[in-house]
């Protein structure tokens, strides 16, 4: 089955190369071709989903391919998926056709280049999640910048050049130091860029590990984005075309949180424990700051962009809790955010296509004119604010309870302050719904608007279905993520053990104090017995 | 005694020299005015010389004054590749302006033969001769169009500063000879002579620093790069830089690897400072440039800084292998990219009615506005070159930067690595500005666009292929570079 992952990974790229040959003038051909390629990619990726094993004997990384690439520099082509990477790959391939379909009418200029950029982007995104070689990961991670830069800069709205240059320079600047850290790792793990081997044999002093973690963390924190390095996000989101916003919110931001989960924490667990309080605090600040900023926005896209800052704060908070619940919730919230915020950007894009404005004040009382759009908007909003029964609830509940139960210093404060973000979220999102869809229809231009078209229904139905399925039956998703979560937890526990051997006065830091939720217990991976339990 | 094997090792040099002489003779005797064969012959000679270099036997030549090895072969291939591409650019550019002559190609071939010899030199005097062979030809090339102010000014500046650098080099070589009684690199490695040797080596390095355009010996670069005819600028950026770095690496390694050498570490430290200055100053000065040709000139200073990082790393025990191969990979990647970029600049250059008209506006970034609409292929190529110069994957520039910084980390030069990556962010900003202009700004009104000459398009296409191939599958080049580094 290993070949399947490679096919899923490179199919969009080859689709993009083939699209180069199609005639420029035939916009419809380009649209259909891109849709076809992304649909085939999605159906093939379902094969990954159904063949992934989560049992006790299952390998950590599945569908692995390991080939030499630049052997004389020690760089290999090594790809494979664990549960978390699989979920994010599925999110990417599922959003692919949705994004392409949503851009059907919006993009009128340079249609050919637009869809080539989208397909190129899809390969780079899947590659980022599938890579198991540090340089290969970096290559995909950086290769995303170019098509995204063009998407915002060429097809964006008025202030696009400023936004896209800011986006590029911010993320490029943040990630170059990670390259130096990767090179340092190479010379201290026996000379390999291979992630699995590096994780095993990395030998660095704690003082150096703190710097290396910082280099990785800065790169990922900008991508997440965490407060206070989030300022590129509102601009990029606001100026990007709908498809760009959806990809940015749906997948690109996850590359930051995934980076923490896959690279920064497992490679430098002790340094991660060192920085945990700081990152957790920044996450909480991000939650509240993002929510407050959302509340005062007059521009719909900007509002949703700031709500992303708030939601990604939850993801980071759950990760820093370093409990089974927190980590699981964090992974789940990555998916939720991709679905619901992606959905919100799609809906905002539909309104904008009809009225050519993003200002909230230009709308009002639309519920009568466009009942279907309004209904779906409300559903997605409820998911975004975490109403029980929707996917958002599962993620936020796991994160907050995981934080509450965690052995951070003052976990109650983190959880309580984080929980205010849920309330603020309800306030700004519901007030958005109210100002756009309810109240009096005062602007005459809003009187005759088309409701959901068939194409748009095809775009939105998968989102709504996912919101319901992931809200009511989260288990398949949680089970898929669980082995990876348990492994990370075991790794963190052995780091804690190591620290406490050196300094017995240290208290326990990983896992929960009391009996945990049934969701994530007992450990699914007996192959890696947690050292903390052994010592008791 | 010169044996057949020696001749075989020197074959690239001989081919280039013979090609140049043939070109000059044919220009005299064949006066039909049809000159298409000349560029074809020059490309053919370049390819043949590169092929000869690949199969050249490894041996010591001229009683140890030169050596043919993997390193010299690699440099020869890069120089010949730069020659072939810039000849293609030159053909179209010169023909449009009606100034195509055999001498142009002859001078380029002579210059390349000097570069090839420079890649082989393991003796200060041979190095000096090679530098002069190369430089005299390039001075003449810079002034090639003869009419017009800028080429003359550029050539004059280049000549004066170049003579000064040569004089410094020669004076240094004489001091080294006085101190050690030999000009062989192997003799330098034995050391002795104390302060006199140090002074001599310092002067030699100053001479070379001028040639590679490292800050603070860079002041000539922007004016010369801007003023010289664009195909010549491409040739200078690709070939002259490669050859100068080849001799710098060989000489510097001899200085630091010897047992009794004075202050090998200090020399490394001095080069490290030059590297930092070049990266910072080159990038900072490139930032405000609106003239693309001048921006590329400043960026070439910054790239000299990155290359110096590799050289410094090669001077340490841990980073020796990684450093040498990184410099070679970087030279190959930079040559392909920069020739391509200048080829695009040449393609966009207006053919002025009279050469006395100042063409500075021809290189303004406004010329690139809307290029993605009017000429999508050219714009795409330029975007690839800009991303490669900025070091964004998956291009050659990324692999090159990766190997340079890998060498720096191997040599535990963390400061150089961190300054290197941070300054490369500045680079991303000004390279992107060209992409912004091409893809995100409307074209200037009333801008008629001439189609690019065929040979220029061919050169651009070849360069794009090279840049992307090096970015995606660099193993063949990286393997060759590593083999070359192991033998050096």
Please identify what each model-predicted range represents.
Chain A
Residues 227, 341-344, 413-448:
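Predominantly late transmembrane helices and immediately cytosolic-facing juxtamembrane segments
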Residues 1-11, 81-92, 134-147, 209-222, ...:
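Structural signature of hydrophobic alpha-helical transmembrane segments
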Residues 1-4, 21-116, 192-200, 508-533:
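Transmembrane helix-loop-helix hairpins at membrane boundaries of multipass inner-membrane proteins
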Residues 16-27, 96-108, 150-159, 224-238, ...:
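C-terminal ends of transmembrane helices
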Residues 25-28, 113-120, 124-208, 293-306, ...:
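Alpha-helical multi-pass transmembrane bundles of energy-transducing inner-membrane proteins
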Residues 52-75, 176-231, 235, 260-278, ...:
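Juxtamembrane/interfacial segments at transmembrane-helix boundaries in multi-pass membrane proteins
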């Amino acid at each position: 089955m290993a070949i399947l992952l490679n096919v899923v990974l490179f199919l969009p790229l080859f689709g993009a190369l083939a699209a180069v040959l199609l005639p420029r003038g035939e916009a419809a051909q380009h649209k259909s071709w891109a849709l076809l390629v992304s649909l085939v990619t999605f159906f093939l990726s379902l094969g990954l989903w159904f063949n992934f094993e989560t049992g006790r004997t299952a390998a950590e990384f599945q569908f692995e391919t390991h080939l030499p690439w630049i052997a004389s520099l020690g760089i290999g082509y090594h790809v494979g998926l664990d549960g978390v990477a699989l979920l994010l790959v599925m999110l990417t391939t599922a959003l692919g056709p949705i994004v392409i379909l949503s851009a059907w009418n919006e993009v009128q200029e340079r249609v050919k280049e637009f869809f080539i950029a989208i397909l190129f982007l899809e390969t780079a995104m899947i590659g980022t999640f599938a890579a198991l070689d540090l340089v290969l990961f970096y290559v995909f991670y950086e290769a995303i910048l170019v098509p995204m830069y063009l998407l915002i800069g060429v097809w964006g709205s008025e202030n696009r050049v400023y936004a896209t240059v800011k986006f590029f320079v911010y993320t490029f600047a943040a990630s170059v130091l990670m390259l130096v850290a990767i090179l340092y790792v190479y010379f201290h793990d026996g000379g390999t860029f291979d992630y699995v081997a590096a994780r095993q044999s990395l030998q660095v002093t704690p003082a150096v590990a703190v710097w290396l973690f910082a280099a990785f963390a800065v790169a990922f924190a900008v991508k997440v984005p965490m407060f206070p390095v989030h300022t590129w996000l509102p601009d990029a989101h606001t100026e990007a075309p709908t498809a760009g916003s959806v990809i940015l919110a749906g997948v690109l931001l996850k590359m930051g949180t995934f980076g923490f989960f896959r690279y920064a924490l497992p490679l430098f667990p002790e340094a991660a424990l060192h920085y945990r309080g700081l990152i957790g605090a920044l996450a909480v600040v991000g939650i509240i700051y993002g929510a407050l900023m959302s509340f005062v926005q007059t521009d719909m896209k900007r509002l949703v962009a700031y709500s992303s800052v708030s939601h990604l704060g939850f993801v980071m908070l759950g990760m820093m809790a370093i409990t089974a619940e927190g980590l699981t919730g964090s992974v789940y919230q990555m998916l939720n955010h991709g679905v619901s915020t992606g959905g919100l950007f799609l809906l905002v894009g539909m309104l904008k296509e009809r009225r050519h404005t993003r200002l909230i004040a230009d709308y009002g009382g639309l519920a009568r004119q466009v009942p279907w759009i309004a209904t779906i908007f409300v559903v997605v909003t409820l998911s975004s604010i975490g109403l029980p029964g929707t996917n958002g609830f599962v993620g936020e509940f796991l994160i907050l309870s995981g934080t509450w139960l965690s052995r951070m210093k003052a976990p109650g404060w983190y959880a309580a302050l984080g929980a205010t973000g849920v309330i603020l979220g309800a306030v700004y999102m519901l007030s958005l719904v109210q100002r756009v869809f309810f109240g009096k229809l005062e602007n005459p231009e809003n009187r005759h608007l088309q409701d959901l078209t068939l194409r748009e229904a095809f775009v939105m139905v998968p989102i709504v279905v996912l919101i319901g399925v992931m809200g009511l039956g989260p288990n398949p998703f949680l089970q898929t993520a669980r082995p990876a979560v348990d492994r990370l937890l075991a790794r963190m526990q052995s780091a804690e053990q190591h620290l406490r051997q050196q300094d017995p006065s240290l208290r326990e830091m990983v896992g929960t104090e009391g009996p945990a939720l049934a969701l994530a217990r007992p450990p699914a991976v007996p192959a890696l017995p947690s050292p903390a339990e052994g010592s008791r | 005694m010169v044996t057949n094997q020696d001749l075989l090792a020197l074959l690239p040099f001989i081919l280039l020299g013979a090609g140049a002489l043939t070109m000059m003779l044919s220009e005299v005797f064949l006066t039909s005015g049809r000159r298409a064969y000349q560029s074809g012959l020059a490309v053919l000679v370049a390819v043949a010389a590169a092929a000869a270099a690949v199969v050249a036997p490894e041996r010591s030549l001229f009683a140890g004054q030169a050596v043919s090895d993997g390193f010299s072969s690699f440099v020869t291939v890069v120089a010949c590749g730069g020659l072939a591409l810039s000849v293609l650019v030159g053909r179209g550019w010169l023909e449009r302006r009606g100034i195509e002559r055999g001498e142009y190609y002859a001078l380029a071939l002579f210059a390349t033969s000097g570069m090839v010899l420079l890649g082989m030199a393991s003796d200060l005097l041979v190095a000096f001769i090679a530098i002069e062979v190369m430089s005299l030809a390039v001075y003449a090339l810079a002034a090639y169009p003869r009419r017009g102010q800028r080429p003359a000014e550029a050539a004059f500046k280049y000549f004066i500063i170049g003579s000064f650098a040569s004089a410094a080099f020669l004076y240094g070589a004489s001091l080294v000879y006085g101190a050690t009684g030999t000009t062989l690199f192997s003799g330098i490695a034995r050391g002795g002579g104390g302060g006199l040797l140090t002074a001599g080596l310092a002067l030699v390095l100053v001479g070379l620093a001028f040639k590679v355009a490292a800050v603070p010996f860079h002041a000539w670069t922007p004016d010369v790069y801007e003023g010289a005819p664009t195909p010549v600028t491409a040739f200078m950026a690709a070939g002259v830089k490669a050859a100068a770095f080849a001799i710098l690496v060989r000489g510097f390694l001899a200085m630091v690897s010897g047992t009794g050498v004075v202050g090998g570490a200090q020399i490394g430290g001095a080069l490290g400072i030059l590297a930092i200055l070049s990266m910072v100053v080159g990038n900072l000065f490139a930032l405000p440039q609106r003239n693309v040709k001048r921006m590329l000139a400043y960026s070439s200073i910054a790239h000299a800084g990155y290359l110096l990082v590799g050289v410094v790393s090669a001077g340490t025990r841990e980073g020796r292998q990684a450093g040498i191969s990184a410099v070679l990979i970087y030279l190959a990647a930079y040559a392909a990219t920069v020739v391509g970029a200048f080829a695009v600049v040449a393609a966009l250059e207006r053919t002025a009615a009279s050469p006395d008209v100042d063409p500075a506006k021809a290189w303004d970034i406004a010329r690139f506005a809307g290029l993605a609409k009017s000429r999508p292929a050219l714009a795409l190529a330029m975007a690839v070159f800009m991303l490669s110069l900025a070091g964004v994957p998956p291009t050659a520039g990324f692999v090159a930067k990766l190997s340079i910084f890998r060498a720096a980390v191997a040599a535990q030069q963390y400061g150089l690595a961190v300054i290197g990556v941070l300054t490369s962010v500045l680079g991303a900003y000004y390279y992107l500005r060209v992409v912004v202009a091409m893809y995100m700004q409307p074209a200037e009104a009333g801008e008629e666009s001439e189609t690019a000459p065929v040979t220029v398009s061919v050169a651009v296409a070849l360069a794009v292929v090279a840049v992307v191939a090096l970015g995606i599958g660099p193993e063949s080049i990286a393997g060759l570079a590593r083999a070359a580094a192991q033998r050096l």
